[in-house]
Amino acid sequence: MLKLKKEDYEKILDHCRKGLPNESCGLLGGTIEDDVKTIEKVYLLTNIDESNEHFSMDPKEQLSAIKDIRQNGYQMIGNFHSHPESPSRPSEEDKRLAFDPNIEYLILSLMDAENPVLKAFGVDKEKNVTVHAVSYTHLRAHETGRNL
């Protein structure tokens, strides 16, 4: 199972909407305990391809995010990207470029602007795709300084 704070979902959604008409992308750092992956920090990266059909993360931003993940004692949970004009499922290119069977691949479809769809996937070494459950959580009051 993958846990994502609603606030982080909103952050990803906002980043992807601002990136339209192109795909947007980023990395996800967090913790892994048993079979539960908890996203603790979302890293919004630049799609240097500036394309609505594929993405390449800015290498400098990617390196900076990986350094921050390590400095915070997090693990690489996965990455995300948007599909501005297609469903929330891995394309053939997404599967081909999925290099690590241990991380999550999140895809946010903006095909229906009023009803975005975020799904998490695993891609094994044979390029078989598995849909993973996403649990949305709220920040605890002490994390925001306010009552929820």
Model regions and ranges:
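Short, surface-exposed acidic-centric catalytic microdomains
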Residues: G26, E33-S51
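Short, surface-exposed loop/turn motifs that are enriched in glycine and acidic residues
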Residues: L2, S51-F55
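Long, hydrophobic N-terminal alpha-helical segment
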Residues: M1-N22
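Active-site-proximal loop/helix of nucleotide/amide-processing enzymes and allied scaffolds
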Residues: S56-V134
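Short, well-structured hydrophobic secondary-structure segments
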Residues: S24-G29, I66-R70
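Short loop/turn motifs at secondary-structure junctions
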Residues: E23, T38, G73-Q75
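Conserved small/polar residues in nucleotide/adenosyl-binding loops
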Residues: T137-T144
